[in-house]
Amino acid sequence: MATYKLDDKQPHPFWDNTLAPRVRVQPGDTVIFETLEASANQVTPASGHEVMASLDFGLIHPLTGPVYVEGAEPGDALEVEIISIKHKGWGWNAVIPGF
């Protein structure tokens, strides 16, 4: 079984089946995903509260991928095992009216 790594350099903001797969895997392969934080780096450790007023909500919750699983067909249920999650050392949270 192979291991693949997808970096966070090509995020996309929503599920889109027209995007070409970044990697094609066989069932049982391992994929390591690097992800951006929820604002796609609009909020950084140096940000103050004022950054919330200028967030581009079209970039919120960036995704890494897509991954094509060989042999999978539309309607199939795929089992995914999350082996570990590692954070990048900081995080943020906000209550945003209307969001």
Can you say where each PLM-predicted feature lies in the sequence?
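N-terminal, charged/glycine-rich beta-strand/loop interface patches
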Residues: 2-99
